[in-house]
Amino acid sequence: MVRGLLVKGGSTRSAYYYDPQKGFPFGHSFTKRYSNDELQEHLILLEARARIGMNKKNCPEHVSSIFDYAFSEMLNNAIEHSHSKQITVSLVLDEATLRFVVEDTGVGVFNSIVKKKRLANNTEAIQDLMKGKTTTAPQAHSGEGIFFTSKCADVFQLQSGETELHISNGKTQELSINSLKPKKRGTRVIFSVSIHSTRHISDIFRAYQT
């Protein structure tokens, strides 16, 4: 949700607002805008981890693995598919939570899927994404990145155009499709996972892959 110039992250009980141009307001934070010119996500990942001081003492290995996968997948989507000239990443690591945002001003994830798959609207694009098999460039990517990233998160938000997909993974998964005002040009991904999460990415892959 966007309120004025602030972006809302998290669920209702743990909501927070931040300026995407400045990054998160607390914890070990890092924000940087990159020119989308031969970017390599693994190098940005290494830089981001170093800048927020991420290590085994403040982030368990299984949570670190979730972050590495989710951040790399969402950044790869922006690099390969958005056609955006610039990509902005924001991260924060505090005593309870690891969060990141990947944002571009490109074609927009829902709009791209609607056009490529000749769907009626953004809701149909979301339904297709949640099947776990969708990509707008199948020769370049498996298309499962958004699906599995949404399963790894405590809270996952995918915002583009007039639409937000909001997923909360507690004892059960809660999924909602919300209206965005003002509209989001391009795509914004907001990902949050607890440092104390018991999820393991290998278990998530086993649960949903056949």
Name each region found by the language model.
Residues L158-S160, E174-A207:
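C-terminal end segment of the histidine kinase catalytic
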Residues D104:
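Acidic ATP/Mg2+-coordinating residue in the GHKL
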Residues A96-F100, T187:
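Short beta-strand element(s) in the Bergerat
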Residues D94-T97, V107, S168-K171, I201-D203:
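Regulatory and interdomain segments flanking nucleotide-handling catalytic cores
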Residues V107-S179:
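Flexible ATP-lid and adjacent glycine-rich G1/G2 motifs of the Bergerat
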Residues V2-R3, V7-S72, D203-T210:
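Bergerat-fold GHKL ATPase/HATPase_c domain
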Residues C59-E95, I146, S150-C152:
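Conserved ATP-binding N-box helix of the HATPase_c
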